Amino acid sequence: MRKAPAAALALALLASAATAQRSGGPFTVEGSGRGFATLQEAVDAIGEGTGTIQIAPGTYRMCAAQNAGSIRYAAREPGTAIFDGVACAGKAALVLSGREARIEGLVFQNIAVPDRNGAGIRLQAGNLVVSESLFRDSEQGILTHDDPASAIRIEQSTFSGLGVCPENGSCAHSIYIGDFGSLSVVRTRFERGRGGHYVKTRSPRVEVVDSSFDDSEGRATNYMIDLSNGATGTIARNVFVQGRNKENYSAMIFVGPEAQSNSSAGLAIADNEATLAPGANATTFVVDRSGETIAIDRNRLGPQITKFARR
C-alpha cells in the first residue's frame, strides 16, 4: 500500500526537475523550453541549427559569440533586456558569424574596448535584421566586416550617443557597414553622435528611408551619411538636423569620399528635409565624388544649405 505514494513522489520529483531545467535561467530556447543562465549557453545549445532565444527583462553584464546557425534574439518585452558594458573578444556584446541573426527589442549600452571600436553588435558574416532595438552611449552601435553575399536591415531602432574620433586613430561611428551586399535603414533614429559619421557604409546598394538624423546635440561629428565607395539605391523621406559642434560640417551626405569602386549612377536622394540647428555653419546637402548622375529631387532645404556640389 505504501508503494503508490512513493511512486507518485518519484514522478513529482522528476516533473519538478524537468520544470527547473526549462526555467533554469533568463535565456530560454523556444521549442525545447530549456532555460540557461548565460546567453552563450543558449547560443551554444542552438549550435548549427535554427532557433529563437527569448530573453527575460533584466540588465546583463555578459556577451555572446554566434559562430554558426540562424538565431533570433528576442526580448520578451521590447526595451527591457539590456546588455551593459561587456564585450566578447574585445569586440562587441554580440559577435555574429553564423548564417543569420535577428535582433528584436534589445538594448546595448556602455560598450568600450581598448581599440575604441566597442560595439553593441560586431557582424563578421551572415545576414542581419535588427528591429525595435536601442544602441546608446558606446563607442559604436554596429560594426561589420565584409560579406558581399549577405544583407543587413535595420528598422524601428535608435542609435544615440555613439561614435568617437581618438587622436591619431580611426574613428568609430554610429553604424559602420563594410562591403555587404546591401544595407537597408528604415524608420530609424540617429541622435547625439559623439564622433564619426552616423551612417558609414561600403555596401554597393543602400536604402535609407523614413528615418531621422538629429545632430543638434552632437559633438565632434562628421557626415550624416557616408557612402564611402559610392552606392546605388534610395535615400528618401528622411529628416536631417545638423548641429553646431562638428568635426566636419561641409556635407550632410557624401557620395564616394574614399573610392568610387561602386557605381552611383541613378542613386536617388528625394523628398528629404534638411535644416541647421541654431548656430550651425552653412553646409552642402549632397557632395559627390563619383562623377556619376545622381537624382536629387524634391528635397526641402533650410537656409544656408546648398543643394549639391562636386569635389
Each language-model region and where it sits:
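Extracellular beta-strand-rich solenoid/capping regions of secreted or surface-exposed proteins
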Residues: 44, 48, 60-74, 82-104, ...
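Extracellular beta-strand/beta-solenoid scaffold signature
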Residues: 85-94, 114-122, 137-146, 166-177, ...
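Right-handed parallel beta-helix
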Residues: 56-57, 74-81, 100-110, 127-137, ...
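Bacterial N-terminal signal peptides
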Residues: 7-14
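Bacterial N-terminal signal peptides that target proteins for export
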Residues: 1-7
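Leucine-rich solenoid repeat scaffolds
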Residues: 281-311
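Acidic Gly/Asp/Thr-rich repetitive segments characteristic of extracellular carbohydrate-active
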Residues: 24-62
